[in-house]
């Protein structure tokens, strides 16, 4: 998938799920399931409930996403 095809949105972590999955509420109110990107996993970036994150989604399935950034 080309980078231009992805949709990036801001959201808040609602809950932590097993296997580094998270339930994220986007700014528009939509709730989706997201996992951590490989670079965040490699660098041991911790994500907790309530954190502001940037989520990358594909236009084909808007119920799943990838967390690519955690705001400080």
Curated annotation (Swiss-Prot):
Summary of subunit composition and partner proteins: Component of the 30S ribosomal translation pre-initiation complex which assembles on the 30S ribosome in the order IF-2 and IF-3, IF-1 and N-formylmethionyl-tRNA(fMet); mRNA recruitment can occur at any time during PIC assembly.
SUPFAM superfamilies cross-referenced by the UniProt entry: Nucleic acid-binding proteins
Entries under PANTHER family matching the protein: TRANSLATION INITIATION FACTOR IF-1, CHLOROPLASTIC
Key words of the record: Cytoplasm, Initiation factor, Protein biosynthesis, RNA-binding, rRNA-binding
Record GO cellular component, one term: cytosol
Residue ranges annotated for the S1-like domain, each copy included: 1-72
CDD domains: S1_IF1 (cd04451)
Gene3D superfamilies: Nucleic acid-binding proteins
GO molecular function, one term: translation initiation factor activity
Function: One of the essential components for the initiation of protein synthesis. Stabilizes the binding of IF-2 and IF-3 on the 30S subunit to which N-formylmethionyl-tRNA(fMet) subsequently binds. Helps modulate mRNA selection, yielding the 30S pre-initiation complex (PIC). Upon addition of the 50S ribosomal subunit IF-1, IF-2 and IF-3 are released leaving the mature 70S translation initiation complex.
UniProt cross-references to InterPro entries, sorted A to Z: NA-bd_OB-fold, RNA-binding_domain_S1_IF1, S1_domain, TIF_IF1
Subcellular compartments: Cytoplasm
SMART domains, per database record: S1
Name of the molecule in the record: Translation initiation factor IF-1
Pfam families registered for this protein in UniProt: eIF-1a
Family statement: Belongs to the IF-1 family.
